[in-house]
Amino acid sequence: MATMIQSLSSLFCFLSLLSLLFSTNLTISESDHIHMSTFCNQFSDNFTQTSTYETNRETVLSSLRLRSSLGSYSNATAGISPDTVRGMFLCRGDISETSCSDCVQTATLEISRNCTYQKEAFIFYEECMVRYSDSSFFSLVDERPYIIRYSLSYAPNLDRFPQTLSDKMDELIINATSSPSLSSTPYFVEDQERVKQFEGSFDIDSMAQCSPDLDPRNCTTCLKLAVQEMLECCNQSRWAQIFTPKCLLRYEATALSSPPPPYPSPPPPSSPLFSPLLPSPPLFKRPQTASGFSGSSSINVIKGN
């Protein structure tokens, strides 16, 4: 009897340990976020360990963590000059409050670990960004640093896609700057459109967002600068995302049908007095995929100050 009780006790301990390990792995997996880049401003002043600035920085980052469950944006300030620290976070408007909070929690911890003594730093994840600085940046447009992530797969209808994308971005900017009265998330708009062209049909999903501390004019400026960088970088990519300190853009194009076949060649004339006609070339040339390109591959473009 004692042996049976001991065996059951051992089995219970084993199952409890297994359950704990499983729940721990699940928690870690759910909290994973795609880190894109960290910028520690090497040109800013440094602070020393246990200094007033370090204390104020931790106060700001802790405040951002606490506020991350309340919305997609918040800012915080701590201390008096010359040790004033300002911070903010911005989450993508299309993610849940839980995902936003998890991302900000991770970002605020990592930025202090990676930028140990710099007075200004930025950290970009696919779902959020966090920054702090000794300089005031609220209500101002910052073009850099920024991070672009894009696919190495070509977009559909390659010959016409850059213009289609440019037109879509212009439309998004107009809608985003008028969204404070249209959306629960200020300066956020997402769109899905089915594009029908002779070469084939495709869906294009897109979104644009500005930090709520910007006014409509500065939001427009920020998004236009982001569009310019994205179009110069990757206007032939199937998807791309750019994240700047004050705004972000994303798009993804999904082909729905293949281009139609070329028109058939006319039959050769029956009269032997004429040579047979050569086959007509295709009206539209389909883009060739570069060696090594695939749908799952992507690349980051990073530009600092």
Swiss-Prot record:
It comes from the Eukaryota. Residues 288-305 have a biased composition (Polar residues). Coiled coil: none annotated. The keyword tRNA-binding does not apply. Residues 258-305 are annotated as: Disordered. Pfam families: Stress-antifung (PF01657). Residues 1-31 form the signal peptide. The keyword tRNA processing does not apply. GO terms for cellular component: extracellular region. Keywords: Repeat, Secreted, Signal. InterPro entries: GNK2, GNK2_sf. Gene3D superfamilies: Gnk2 domain, C-X8-C-X2-C motif. Residues 258-271 have a biased composition (Pro residues). It is found in: Secreted. Residues 35-137, 143-256 form the Gnk2-homologous domain. Belongs to the cysteine-rich repeat secretory protein family. This is Cysteine-rich repeat secretory protein 4.
